[in-house]
From Swiss-Prot:
Keywords in alphabetical order: Hydrolase, Metal-binding, Zinc
Name recorded for this polypeptide: Anti-Pycsar protein Apyc1
Record's miscellaneous remark: This homolog of an antiviral immune evasion nuclease may be due to cryptic prophages, or it may play a role in regulating the endogenous antiviral defense system based on cyclic nucleotides.
Signal peptide: none
Subunit structure: Homodimer.
Region annotation Beta-lactamase-like: where it falls in the sequence: 17-215
One Pfam family hit: Anti-Pycsar_Apyc1
Role according to the record: Counteracts the endogenous Pycsar antiviral defense system. Phosphodiesterase that enables metal-dependent hydrolysis of host cyclic nucleotide Pycsar defense signals such as cCMP and cUMP.
Entry binding sites for Zn(2+) 2: 59, 61, 142
Species per Swiss-Prot/TrEMBL record: Paenibacillus harenae
Keyword Cytoplasm in record: no
Gene3D superfamilies for this protein: Ribonuclease Z/Hydroxyacylglutathione hydrolase-like
Length: 241
């Protein structure tokens, strides 16, 4: 299993594009989140939407779903395909009603299912996405009263998406066999809706060595050598996980 970050930036970062990723397993390509900058960033990588087999959404914020309108329109009108959308059952209605409906609706096309092959996922239940690729959606805290999910792939790779620091969860995952953690990281205090670097630095050395930092701000270069045993994910670089 390999991952390439299309972007590694925080919601307000201007240098690194939205924190979205391509996860590859046995010839299948899963897009993890589809933010505002995703269409352009994907193009700059020399890739196009038809090369994506499915998209998996973590929560409803523009840097994670803001590119879905263009994705849907391109696939429908340019490529005559309905892309597969893996999504928590709790996110289906808010994604359509609060984010996509205004831009995508053109009668008689007025449902999410008109644009995507919607595959609902129930949280905390392991689901096979492709042969050899399984995911478990873990409800995590990000914004109060707003559902948000992190992803556990094949019981060994944890992808936080956006979440507040949860030391207990990270220790439990590491003890349970997780080998690699890609975690969002807010560089400056306080970490209100994301884990801060200082919070992540409280993790044991053994867990830090498994942890890679993503979803960071434009000042990340100032933090080189200041991240303990954790490493910084580089955009567009391919990692085995």
């Amino acid at each position: 299993m390999h991952i390439r970050m299309v972007g590694t930036g925080s919601a307000f970062a201007k240098k690194f594009d939205n924190n979205n990723a391509l996860l590859e397993q046995d010839g299948c390509c899963l897009l993890i989140d589809c933010g505002i900058t995703l269409p352009k960033a994907l193009y700059q990588m020399g890739l196009a939407f038809p090369e994506i087999d499915a998209v998996l959404i973590s929560h409803i914020h523009a840097d994670h779903v803001g590119g879905l309108e263009e994705f849907a329109f391109q696939m429908m009108f340019k490529y005559n395909r309905k892309p597969v959308l893996f999504i928590a059952d709790t996110l289906i209605e808010p994604l359509w009603e609060h984010t996509l409906r205004g831009g995508l609706t053109q009668d008689p096309l007025n449902k999410l299912e008109h644009f995507f092959d919607v595959r609902p996922i129930i949280a905390n239940t392991e689901t096979e996405l492709f042969p050899g690729l399984r995911v478990k959606l873990l409800p995590t805290k990000h914004i109060p009263n707003k559902p948000s999910y992190s992803f556990l792939f094949n019981d060994r790779f944890f992808y936080s998406a956006d979440m507040r620091f949860d030391k207990e969860l990270l220790l439990r995952l590491a003890d349970g066999g997780v080998q690699t953690i890609f975690h969002d990281c807010q560089l400056e205090e306080p970490g209100v809706v994301h884990a801060s670097l200082n919070e992540l630095l409280t993790l044991p050395e053994s867990v830090q060595k498994k942890t890679w930092l993503m979803h960071y701000g434009d000042t990340i270069d100032q933090y080189q050598g200041r991240t303990g045993h954790m490493r910084i994910v580089e955009p567009q670089r391919r990692y085995e996980v």
